[in-house]
A protein has these predicted regions:
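N-terminal glycine-rich anion-binding loop in soluble enzyme alpha/beta folds
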Residues: 2-39
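Active-site histidine-anchored catalytic micro-motif
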Residues: 3, 27-32, 44-54, 59-69, ...
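A residue-level signal for conserved active-site and pocket-lining positions in enzyme catalytic cores
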Residues: 9, 70, 133
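Histidine (H) residue identity feature
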Residues: 15, 38, 62-65, 80, ...
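N-terminal auxiliary interaction/assembly segments of multi-subunit proteins
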Residues: 35-46, 148-149
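Anionic-ligand-binding alpha/beta catalytic cores of soluble enzymes and soluble regulatory domains
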Residues: 116-149
Protein backbone atom coordinates (compact mmCIF):
# COMPACT_ATOMS: atom_id res chain seq x y z
CA UNK A 1 0.00 0.00 0.00
CA UNK A 2 1.44 3.37 -1.00
CA UNK A 3 1.53 6.54 1.06
CA UNK A 4 1.52 9.98 -0.59
CA UNK A 5 1.75 13.27 1.30
CA UNK A 6 0.56 16.60 -0.06
CA UNK A 7 1.97 20.02 0.79
CA UNK A 8 0.47 22.84 -1.28
CA UNK A 9 -0.43 26.50 -1.36
CA UNK A 10 -3.78 25.64 -2.93
CA UNK A 11 -5.91 26.33 0.16
CA UNK A 12 -9.13 24.51 0.98
CA UNK A 13 -11.79 26.93 -0.23
CA UNK A 14 -12.21 25.47 -3.71
CA UNK A 15 -12.10 22.16 -5.55
CA UNK A 16 -8.40 21.81 -6.47
CA UNK A 17 -7.21 19.59 -3.60
CA UNK A 18 -10.32 17.41 -3.78
CA UNK A 19 -9.95 17.02 -7.56
CA UNK A 20 -6.30 15.96 -7.21
CA UNK A 21 -7.16 13.46 -4.49
CA UNK A 22 -10.12 12.12 -6.44
CA UNK A 23 -8.00 11.47 -9.49
CA UNK A 24 -5.26 9.85 -7.37
CA UNK A 25 -7.80 7.55 -5.68
CA UNK A 26 -9.21 6.65 -9.12
CA UNK A 27 -5.82 5.83 -10.65
CA UNK A 28 -4.27 4.30 -7.53
CA UNK A 29 -6.87 2.25 -5.64
CA UNK A 30 -5.73 1.60 -2.08
CA UNK A 31 -3.36 4.58 -1.93
CA UNK A 32 -3.25 6.49 1.36
CA UNK A 33 -3.05 10.27 1.11
CA UNK A 34 -1.97 12.46 4.02
CA UNK A 35 -2.32 16.24 3.93
CA UNK A 36 0.68 17.94 5.50
CA UNK A 37 -0.70 21.39 4.69
CA UNK A 38 -2.67 23.23 2.03
CA UNK A 39 -2.44 26.56 3.85
CA UNK A 40 1.07 27.56 2.77
CA UNK A 41 1.02 31.26 1.76
CA UNK A 42 0.88 31.54 -2.04
CA UNK A 43 4.23 30.86 -3.75
CA UNK A 44 6.10 30.81 -0.40
CA UNK A 45 8.33 27.78 -0.93
CA UNK A 46 10.47 28.78 2.07
CA UNK A 47 7.46 28.40 4.39
CA UNK A 48 6.58 25.16 2.61
CA UNK A 49 10.10 23.86 3.25
CA UNK A 50 9.82 24.73 6.95
CA UNK A 51 6.45 22.99 7.33
CA UNK A 52 7.49 19.97 5.25
CA UNK A 53 10.87 19.55 6.95
CA UNK A 54 9.21 19.42 10.36
CA UNK A 55 6.81 16.67 9.24
CA UNK A 56 8.90 14.67 6.73
CA UNK A 57 11.01 12.68 9.18
CA UNK A 58 7.94 11.20 10.89
CA UNK A 59 6.78 9.35 7.77
CA UNK A 60 7.79 5.77 7.01
CA UNK A 61 10.27 4.79 4.27
CA UNK A 62 8.89 4.58 0.74
CA UNK A 63 6.54 7.52 1.24
CA UNK A 64 6.10 9.76 -1.81
CA UNK A 65 5.93 13.46 -0.93
CA UNK A 66 4.36 15.95 -3.34
CA UNK A 67 5.07 19.64 -2.77
CA UNK A 68 3.08 22.01 -5.01
CA UNK A 69 4.29 25.49 -4.13
CA UNK A 70 5.91 28.20 -6.28
CA UNK A 71 3.89 27.65 -9.38
CA UNK A 72 2.38 30.96 -10.34
CA UNK A 73 -0.19 30.19 -13.01
CA UNK A 74 -0.55 32.49 -16.00
CA UNK A 75 2.99 33.80 -15.82
CA UNK A 76 4.07 35.65 -18.91
CA UNK A 77 7.81 35.63 -18.21
CA UNK A 78 10.18 32.68 -18.62
CA UNK A 79 10.72 31.95 -14.93
CA UNK A 80 8.55 28.84 -15.23
CA UNK A 81 10.52 26.04 -13.59
CA UNK A 82 10.35 22.34 -14.17
CA UNK A 83 9.95 19.62 -11.57
CA UNK A 84 12.43 17.58 -9.57
CA UNK A 85 11.99 14.03 -8.32
CA UNK A 86 14.46 13.47 -5.52
CA UNK A 87 15.20 10.15 -3.88
CA UNK A 88 16.03 10.94 -0.28
CA UNK A 89 16.74 7.81 1.71
CA UNK A 90 14.00 5.39 0.73
CA UNK A 91 11.45 8.13 0.07
CA UNK A 92 10.69 10.28 -2.97
CA UNK A 93 10.13 14.02 -2.98
CA UNK A 94 8.41 15.66 -5.95
CA UNK A 95 8.86 19.42 -5.99
CA UNK A 96 9.53 22.39 -8.22
CA UNK A 97 13.09 22.96 -9.37
CA UNK A 98 13.29 26.13 -7.28
CA UNK A 99 15.76 25.27 -4.53
CA UNK A 100 13.10 23.70 -2.31
CA UNK A 101 15.07 20.52 -1.61
CA UNK A 102 18.17 22.42 -0.47
CA UNK A 103 16.00 24.08 2.21
CA UNK A 104 14.89 20.67 3.47
CA UNK A 105 18.24 18.88 3.67
CA UNK A 106 21.92 19.67 3.45
CA UNK A 107 22.64 16.08 2.38
CA UNK A 108 22.97 15.16 -1.26
CA UNK A 109 20.04 13.08 -2.50
CA UNK A 110 20.68 9.49 -3.58
CA UNK A 111 19.23 10.35 -6.99
CA UNK A 112 17.53 13.32 -8.54
CA UNK A 113 16.00 13.90 -11.95
CA UNK A 114 14.72 17.02 -13.63
CA UNK A 115 11.47 16.97 -15.57
CA UNK A 116 10.94 19.86 -17.96
CA UNK A 117 7.84 21.91 -17.28
CA UNK A 118 5.16 22.18 -19.91
CA UNK A 119 4.50 25.29 -21.95
CA UNK A 120 0.82 24.83 -21.10
CA UNK A 121 0.05 26.51 -17.80
CA UNK A 122 -3.26 25.45 -16.30
CA UNK A 123 -4.40 23.79 -13.11
CA UNK A 124 -6.03 20.95 -15.08
CA UNK A 125 -2.83 20.26 -17.03
CA UNK A 126 -0.69 20.39 -13.89
CA UNK A 127 -3.03 18.01 -12.05
CA UNK A 128 -2.95 15.53 -14.93
CA UNK A 129 0.85 15.72 -15.12
CA UNK A 130 1.24 15.20 -11.35
CA UNK A 131 -1.20 12.30 -11.16
CA UNK A 132 0.65 10.53 -13.98
CA UNK A 133 4.00 11.19 -12.30
CA UNK A 134 2.78 9.90 -8.92
CA UNK A 135 1.29 6.85 -10.65
CA UNK A 136 4.70 6.11 -12.19
CA UNK A 137 6.45 6.52 -8.82
CA UNK A 138 3.97 4.29 -6.99
CA UNK A 139 4.60 1.63 -9.64
CA UNK A 140 8.38 1.97 -9.17
CA UNK A 141 9.20 3.35 -12.60
CA UNK A 142 12.96 4.08 -12.60
CA UNK A 143 13.79 7.74 -12.08
CA UNK A 144 16.01 7.70 -15.15
CA UNK A 145 12.91 7.01 -17.27
CA UNK A 146 11.06 9.98 -15.76
CA UNK A 147 13.55 12.77 -16.37
CA UNK A 148 17.13 13.92 -16.84
CA UNK A 149 19.75 13.54 -14.08
Amino acid sequence: MSLITLTTDWGLTDHYVAALKGELFSMLPGVNIVDISHQIPAYNFMKAAFVFKNAFYFFPPHTIHLICVDKQLNRTDDTHTGWMVVQYGESMIVCRNNGFFTLVSKQEPLKAVYIEGSEEVSVAHEKSFLVTLLHDLVHNKPLEELGQP
